[in-house]
Amino acid sequence: MTTNAPGAVILAAGKGTRMKSRLPKVLHPIAGKPMLGHVLSAVSALGSERPVLVVGPGMDEVATYARGLVSGLTIAVQEKQLGTGDAVRAAAPHIDKKESVVLVVFGDTPLVRAETLADMTRRCEEGSDIVVLGFEAADPTGYGRLILDGNDVVRIVEHKDASEEERKNKLCFGGPMAVRAAHLPALLAKLTNKNAQGEFYMTDFVAHGRAAGLVCSAVFCLEADMQGVNSRADLAAAEATMQQRLRMAAMAGGVTMLDPSSVYLSMDTEFGEDVTVGQNVVFGPGCVIANGVTIKAFSHLEGAHVAEGAEIGPFARIRPGSEIGRKARIGNFVETKKARIEDGAKVNHLSYIGDARVGAGANIGAGTITCNYDGYNKFFTDIGAGAFIGSNSSLVAPVSIGDGAYLGSGSVVTKDVAADALGVARARQFEKPGWAAAFHAKHKDKKKASGE
């Protein structure tokens, strides 16, 4: 996106106490992906290979997650929560000396776009020494204000330190900042904590830079892109914004959504063209949906691959490891897990198919269960191509049903059934004429004798 990849500092040392959670704030998910992961992905899209993540003491869980996502990442620890400027100071010794531009972003702003960060970096490359990210807020309460002189940023005033006149200004500072690396040491050295909070503010870079004759400018984005997350309510708002982005992108790519606001996607959900998605469908992580698939209302998919022309739902649950073949059919109240449903196979109602293969063109009757777990281990069920499994059958794994075999309804199968054979595993039906009448008469006489 840019000629030269920037250095990057991600600030993630906040304790997130308002989240009321044992999980670190930046690891709370948005669209199935931790907030910090969204930010790291945006930074990585710019080509930054050695970003620095600033965490607080004891935030090993955050550091471990980030290292697993970005191999070249360095961890810096901010020992005390003394403000954003102090956090950048903690990162400074770890910034690669080769970097010409350093981009500072926040781990709790998961909606920031890589394109916006690229614009900031490009502005630095084109002559600005400091570039801040701003937006116009509908309600600017709580935000730092951008004070402009034409196209130049004069200073950033924190809300608590702003005058009444400055608080009327709706141009706000979003948080991210790009700085020419050569100026960073001097800017850090000039920071003081003479403010209402007694903290070292990164926002003071602008005033100090201006005083030193540096060029300070701004790049602007939508307010929604700068939604920060400090509470569960903020998390819900950010989720709603991200979901709307994902829905719009899916529909632009050829997906029909009958009620878009009720469909929930994950960041890695992949769609082909001419996919139709019904109401209240949820896509967990790891779903790949091919061309022409129909997913009906109230279905839940996770870790699933669905091939061209297949039909899912309504009320289907497709769990991780499921592979649904071309023109296969998974109907209402069917659950699959680690199951390969091959081309044209049908599992139409009320079934559990786990640790199994259902061959091409096979038909699974209502109420069929693959009994795959003995309390300690999982076992595999293999159902051949063209097999017919009668309703209300239990297949006790490990077991194999051959190609073209026919299994009688109500069977409890514990042994393999050969190809093209009929398998019936149930008690033989018998009849006792008059038994029911005698039974009822006997019990009625007992009730009468006891006075009931």
From Swiss-Prot:
It catalyses: alpha-D-glucosamine 1-phosphate + acetyl-CoA = N-acetyl-alpha-D-glucosamine 1-phosphate + CoA + H(+); N-acetyl-alpha-D-glucosamine 1-phosphate + UTP + H(+) = UDP-N-acetyl-alpha-D-glucosamine + diphosphate. Residues 254-452 are annotated as: N-acetyltransferase. Keywords: Acyltransferase, Cell shape, Cell wall biogenesis/degradation, Cytoplasm, Magnesium, Metal-binding, Multifunctional enzyme, Nucleotidyltransferase, Peptidoglycan synthesis, Repeat, Transferase. Mg(2+) binds at residues 108, 230. CDD domains: GT2_GlmU_N_bac, LbH_GlmU_C. Residues 1-232 are annotated as: Pyrophosphorylase. It comes from the Bacteria. Binds 1 Mg(2+) ion per subunit. One of its GO terms (cellular component) is membrane. Residues 233-253 are annotated as: Linker. Coiled coil: none annotated. It is found in: Cytoplasm. The keyword Cytoplasm applies. Acetyl-CoA binds at residues 366, 372-373, 391, 409, 426. It is an enzyme of class 2 (transferase). Its EC number is 2.7.7.23, 2.3.1.157. HAMAP family: GlmU. Catalyzes the last two sequential reactions in the de novo biosynthetic pathway for UDP-N-acetylglucosamine (UDP-GlcNAc). The C-terminal domain catalyzes the transfer of acetyl group from acetyl coenzyme A to glucosamine-1-phosphate (GlcN-1-P) to produce N-acetylglucosamine-1-phosphate (GlcNAc-1-P), which is converted into UDP-GlcNAc by the transfer of uridine 5-monophosphate (from uridine 5-triphosphate), a reaction catalyzed by the N-terminal domain. PANTHER family: BIFUNCTIONAL PROTEIN GLMU, NUCLEOTIDYL TRANSFERASE. This is Bifunctional protein GlmU. The gene is glmU.
